[in-house]
């Protein structure tokens, strides 16, 4: 409003009219020397001054900062002012709005919440009273809308109410500045900065005074939009208008701080200092000065300034920044409890929007060892600042070392750590600490990448820091190499780690370290030595490994892993007794170790000692795990024990059901404990297959293979089920796939299985090859030999049964029968070789019978061999005969092709000779007209031609021809021009046919065109080039009246240079014509026609009317115009319609 508290024009005097004065008598109150409040009240009351004068006097006191008198006058005006005049309602509303605005301003500035609420309540009462007088007055709505902005924290819809009222005021009074500023403020708080700038600029244009705060608002909008140059310009402009504007100084100082320039930083600090001197409680100046003194190590001074900023301000974001500065000061002083307190307040002050507060609070949580809370804080920072490398490094390290109660959550944290550290190393690839953390996280999931990171960290330590890697790091590198089966490199790193650790322990510093940390250092050394022995074991240097294990258990008798490895080494040497002794020694040191009891149980299981093995696994379940959480491995092992007893040939029949139930029970228990236990599921499938439930067994095995394709046994079991279901080809495929996938090409057992499948599928050659591969590994296996003989016998029998067989096939079958006979006789006569490795006995009687059958087949094979040889001989003779006939036919075809080729060559030669003779004849014909031309040049033909051509009006070139000159053009050029003219004439004929009126005219034109072309062709054959160039075409004279009679007519014997000032053109160029010319004269398009003097009319006319070139003669360039007709409306149709007549002048060529 124009008379608002901030926008009232200053007056030097206030004139108050005297009571009952008929003249203009007034009492003047000097504004520079205002009297006391009581005196002014007496004057106003005595003269019964109007309410408007009370308001003016009160505002003047407010301008002079005498607020008490201002309030006293306005509050007294309601009951003591004169109200009997027109427009008093408006003044009453005005007085209420001024009072409400005062209380509104006081409430906005008040820090105490209770007082703030009281001030706003008083303003609300006054505004409600003013609403009863004139609710929709624009000045009242403006002030009330600003009141909504001031108390916006009480209700969420205050912005909407204020915006609605501002919109109404702007529509009612568009030039009012206050609603424009209010809309700009609302748009700024809604983060619609472009709209805010629009309203700020509009307010500046409407404002009668230059207000610096509007420029400050524009600067803040540009800063929020990231347009720092424009923001800087706005703040500088505000300071030009008002040099002591604190907000402009602070805004400009913040921009200068972000330039990171030394001079700019000094200027920014000076601006903040000036702001502080002008307004000591300005929070922005206080905060930035606190930040400045913090970096100058004046911590207490920085903390004091930050404390004042937090005390003198109610803005949540500024309070959060102030608390953060206070927490940082306490953090730098080592007062971590105080730092935690202020960081926490900074986070809570602005609803967690202050990012750096989360960072500092996370550091305090790390100091308190509250890793999970620290992870939450740094995770928040990382989401808001995803490219901050410091946050990524700290967060990744926290994820790498946190230990959560839930294993799934721990695994998830590890994965997040991998992601964060990987992103960090992509930016900072020279941080060895991050490399080590990420390498530790990747040891189990990506050993190759982990190894690269470890090696990179070692290189960075050696090159950048000149620090030798620690033994623990070298040990980890060796373990990774060993997991990747690079045992030589693993051995190298284990030895380096061992030497490095021993070197540290032998030094004086290392000795002190050993006294302080003797147990960890010894354990590290034992671990490195154990890993080195394990690596040597993988390198097949078992003697060295065994000695190292013995040294380890001797030095540290309680190192149970050494006993386990010694037991395994002796077990692999088939020294079962010594293996059991080592394992029993391990049991002495650790009675509750399930691994030791498991290895002992496996020893009994390997020796088919079912009862001892059963007791060991039952001991593990009952004593070690107390039947609370059973060991899945022991359950599966017990199931295997019961199932193996089913396969024992000496088992009792009545115990079969008990074994099946117990084995199935153990497998099911293990599967319930570990639903993904493939060994338990495979055991259930084996029990179902034993019960001949082939479909169910196949389903179980298939599910196991779907879950993991690296389980070799399940592939074999699926193939076995296919064999039992007589699916021979499927079994062959499964056996072959398992052999390729698991690289079992040299496995004799698998080859034996495959051979059986081939045999069942009647693929005898493949079965023979598979058995041969199997026998290479087990030469003493009687069962393999027997099966090989069976295959040889059956293969030979199949050959002998065939109707068509060669002598080679019969000979091979005889050899197979002989070898099979030897195998059967060998097995039947040797008692010590008649049992297979599975314990299954091969009957000698059957072998003897098979040998006898082989001999019978050999007898039959001799007759088959003779017949096969006879048949082979006949086939050989037939093949020779066919080959001879084939060769004779090929020779005949070659001879025919040669004769045809010679005939073609002769034909081409004849055609070539004929063409040469034709060319010679043509040359004679072409020379003949030149001789005639020479004779005629001296005769009377020239005179006759000149006489006949008197009617032509020629250009200079044509005139030269009539004089016997060539006009500077040779014969070759004239020939080319004639060809061009002929082509253009043919094109014009086509257009005339297309534009002509009916089919009769088309036929007549076509006939004339053909006759003319035939005549031209004959003429060209008779005349030479020079003669052809001298023949002139016929011209026609149009009788059209469309040409201009008043134009001068060119002389027939004058040249183009004299008549037409235009540059000379070629006689084939087309004159420029209008569209009307094209409509009436299609025959003259792109051609020049010679104008002819008509003897009857004595006038020269062009080829059409209305043309721009009617004053020039149209030169015809064709010599066959006797058949041309004017096109369009100027020609006569076939039905005899009238048209302008043309007089045809024929040349001597006709």
UniProtKB/Swiss-Prot annotation:
Residues 935-1150 are annotated as: Disordered. Disruption phenotype: RNAi-mediated knock-down is mostly embryonic lethal. Embryogenesis proceeds more slowly, with embryos displaying defects in the positioning and shape of epidermal cells. Randomly orientated microtubules are present in epidermal cells during the epidermal elongation process. F-actin accumulation is visible at the leading edge during ventral closure and circumferential actin bundles are present in epidermal cells. Decreased expression of pafo-1, increased cytoplasmic expression of leo-1 and increased nuclear expression of rtfo-1. The gene is ctr-9. Component of the PAF1 complex which is a multifunctional complex involved in transcription initiation via genetic interactions with TATA-binding proteins, elongation and transcription-coupled histone modification. Ctr-9 is required for epidermal microtubule organization during morphogenesis. Pfam families: TPR_19, TPR_8. InterPro entries: Ctr9, TPR-like_helical_dom_sf, TPR_rpt. It comes from Caenorhabditis elegans. The keyword Repeat applies. TPR repeats lie at residues 143-176, 177-210, 212-245, 247-282, 320-353, 355-388, 432-464, 471-504, 594-627, 643-677, 679-711, 712-745, 748-781. Residues 975-992 have a biased composition (Basic residues). One of its GO terms (cellular component) is nucleus. Residues 848-916, 972-1028 form a coiled coil. PROSITE patterns: TPR, TPR_REGION. It comes from the Eukaryota. It is found in: Nucleus. This is RNA polymerase-associated protein CTR9. Its main location: nucleus. Residues 993-1005, 1013-1024, 1060-1084, 1132-1150 have a biased composition (Basic and acidic residues). GO terms for molecular function: RNA polymerase II complex binding. GO terms for biological process: regulation of DNA-templated transcription; transcription elongation by RNA polymerase II.
């Amino acid at each position: 409003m124009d008379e608002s508290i901030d926008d009232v024009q200053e007056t030097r005097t206030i004139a108050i009219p005297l009571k009952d004065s008929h003249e203009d008598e007034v009492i003047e109150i000097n504004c520079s020397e205002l009297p006391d409040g009581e005196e002014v009240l007496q004057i106003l009351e005595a003269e019964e001054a109007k309410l408007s004068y009370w308001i003016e006097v009160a505002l003047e006191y407010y301008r002079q900062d005498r607020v008490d008198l201002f309030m006293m006058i306005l509050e007294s005006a309601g009951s003591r002012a004169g109200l009997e005049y027109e427009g008093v309602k408006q003044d009453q509303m005005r007085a209420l709005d001024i009072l409400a605005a005062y209380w509104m301003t006081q409430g906005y500035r008040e820090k105490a919440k209770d007082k703030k609420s009281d001030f706003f309540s008083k303003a609300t009462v006054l505004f409600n009273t003013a609403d009863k007088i004139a609710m929709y007055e624009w000045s009242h709505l403006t002030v009330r809308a600003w009141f909504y902005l001031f108390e916006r924290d009480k209700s969420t819809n205050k912005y909407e109410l204020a915006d609605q009222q501002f919109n109404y005021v702007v529509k009612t009074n568009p030039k009012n500045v206050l609603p424009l500023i209010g809309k700009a403020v609302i748009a700024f708080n809604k983060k619609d900065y472009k709209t805010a700038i629009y309203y700020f600029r509009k307010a500046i244009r409407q404002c009668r005074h230059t207000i610096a705060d509007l420029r400050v608002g524009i600067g803040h909008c540009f800063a929020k939009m990231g347009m720092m140059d424009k923001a800087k310009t706005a703040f500088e402009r505000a300071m030009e208008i008002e040099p002591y504007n604190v907000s402009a100084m602070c805004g400009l100082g913040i921009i200068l701080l972000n330039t990171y320039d030394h001079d700019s930083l000094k200027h920014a600090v000076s601006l903040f200092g000036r702001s502080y001197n002008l307004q000591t409680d300005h929070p922005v100046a206080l905060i930035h000065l606190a930040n400045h003194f913090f970096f100058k190590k004046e911590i207490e001074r920085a903390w004091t300034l930050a404390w004042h900023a937090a005390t003198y301000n109610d803005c949540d974001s500024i309070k959060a920044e102030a608390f953060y500065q206070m927490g940082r000061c306490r953090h730098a002083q080592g007062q971590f409890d105080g730092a935690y307190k202020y960081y926490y307040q900074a986070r809570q002050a602005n609803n967690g929007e202050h990012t750096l507060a989360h960072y500092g609070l996370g550091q305090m949580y790390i100091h308190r060892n509250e890793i999970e809370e620290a992870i939450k804080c740094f995770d928040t920072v990382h989401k808001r600042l995803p490219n901050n490398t410091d946050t990524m490094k700290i967060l990744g390290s926290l994820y790498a070392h946190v230990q959560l109660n839930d294993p799934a959550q721990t695994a998830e944290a590890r994965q997040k750590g991998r992601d964060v550290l990987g992103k960090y190393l992509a930016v900072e690839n020279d941080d060895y600490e991050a490399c080590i953390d990420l390498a530790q996280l990747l040891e189990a999931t990506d050993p190759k990448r982990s190894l690269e990171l470890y090696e990179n960290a070692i290189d960075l330590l050696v090159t950048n820091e000149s620090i030798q890697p620690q033994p623990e790091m070298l040990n980890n590198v060796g373990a990774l190499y060993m997991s990747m089966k690079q045992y030589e490199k693993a051995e190298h790193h284990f030895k380096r780690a061992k030497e490095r650790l021993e070197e540290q322990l032998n030094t004086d510093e290392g000795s002190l370290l050993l006294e302080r940390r003797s147990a960890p250092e010894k354990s590290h050394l034992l671990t490195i030595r154990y890993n080195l022995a394990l690596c040597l074991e993988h390198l097949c240097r078992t003697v060295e490994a065994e000695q190292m294990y013995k040294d380890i258990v001797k030095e540290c008798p309680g190192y149970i892993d050494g006993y386990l490895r010694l037991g395994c080494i002796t077990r692999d040497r088939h020294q079962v007794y010594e293996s059991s002794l080592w394992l029993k020694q391990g049991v002495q040191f650790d009675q509750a170790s399930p691994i030791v009891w498991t290895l002992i149980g496996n020893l009994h299981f390997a020796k088919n000692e079912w009862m001892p093995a059963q007791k060991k696994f039952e001991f593990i379940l009952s004593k070690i795990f107390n039947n609370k959480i059973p060991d899945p491995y022991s359950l599966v092992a017990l199931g295997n024990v019961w199932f193996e007893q089913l396969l024992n040939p000496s088992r009792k029949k009545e115990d079969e059901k008990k074994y099946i139930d117990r084995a199935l029970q153990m497998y099911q228990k293990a599967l319930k404990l570990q639903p993904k236990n493939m060994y338990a599921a495979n055991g259930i499938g084996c029990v179902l297959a034993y019960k001949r439930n082939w479909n169910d067994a196949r389903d179980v095995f298939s599910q196991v293979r779907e879950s993991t394709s690296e389980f070799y046994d399940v592939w074999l079991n699926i193939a076995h089920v296919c064999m039992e279901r007589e699916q021979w080809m499927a079994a062959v495929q499964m056996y072959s796939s398992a052999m390729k996938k698991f690289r079992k090409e040299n496995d004799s057992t698998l080859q034996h299985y495959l051979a059986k499948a081939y045999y069942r599928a009647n693929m005898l050659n493949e079965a023979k090859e598979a058995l041969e591969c199997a026998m290479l590994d087990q030469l003493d296996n009687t069962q393999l030999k027997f099966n090989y003989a069976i295959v040889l016998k059956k293969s030979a029998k199949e050959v002998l049964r065939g109707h068509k067989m060669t002598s080679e096939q019969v000979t091979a079958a005889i050899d197979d029968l002989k070898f099979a006979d030897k195998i059967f006789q060998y097995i039947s006569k040797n008692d010590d070789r008649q049992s297979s490795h599975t314990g299954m006995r091969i009957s000698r009687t059957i072998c003897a019978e098979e040998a006898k059958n082989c001999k019978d087949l050999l007898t039959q094979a001799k007759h088959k061999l003779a017949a096969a040889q006879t048949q082979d001989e006949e086939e050989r003779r037939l093949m020779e005969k066919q080959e001879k006939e084939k060769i004779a036919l090929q020779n005949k075809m070659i001879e025919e092709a040669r004769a045809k080729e010679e005939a073609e060559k002769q034909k081409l030669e004849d055609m070539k000779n004929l063409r040469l003779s034709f060319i010679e004849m043509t040359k004679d014909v072409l020379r003949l007209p030149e001789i005639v031309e020479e004779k005629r040049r001296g005769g009377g033909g020239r005179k006759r031609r000149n006489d006949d051509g008197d009617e032509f009006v020629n250009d200079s070139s044509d005139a030269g021809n009539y004089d016997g000159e060539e006009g500077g053009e040779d014969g070759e050029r004239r020939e080319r021009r004639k060809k061009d003219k002929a082509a253009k004439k043919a094109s014009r004929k086509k257009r005339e046919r297309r534009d002509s009126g009916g089919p009769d005219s088309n036929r007549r034109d076509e006939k004339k065109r053909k006759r003319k072309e035939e005549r031209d062709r004959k003429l060209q054959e008779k005349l030479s080039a020079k003669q052809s160039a001298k023949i002139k075409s016929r011209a026609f004279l149009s009788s059209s009246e469309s040409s201009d009679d008043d134009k001068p007519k060119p002389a027939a014997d004058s040249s183009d240079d004299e008549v037409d000032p235009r540059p000379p053109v070629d006689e084939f160029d087309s004159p420029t014509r209008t569209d009307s010319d094209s409509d009436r004269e299609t025959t003259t398009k792109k051609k020049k026609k010679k104008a002819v003097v008509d003897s009857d009319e004595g006038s020269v006319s062009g080829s059409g009317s209305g043309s721009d070139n009617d004053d020039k003669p149209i030169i015809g360039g064709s010599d066959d115009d006797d058949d041309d007709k004017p096109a369009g409306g100027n020609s006569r149709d076939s039905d005899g319609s009238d048209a302008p007549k043309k007089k045809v002048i024929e040349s001597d060529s006709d």
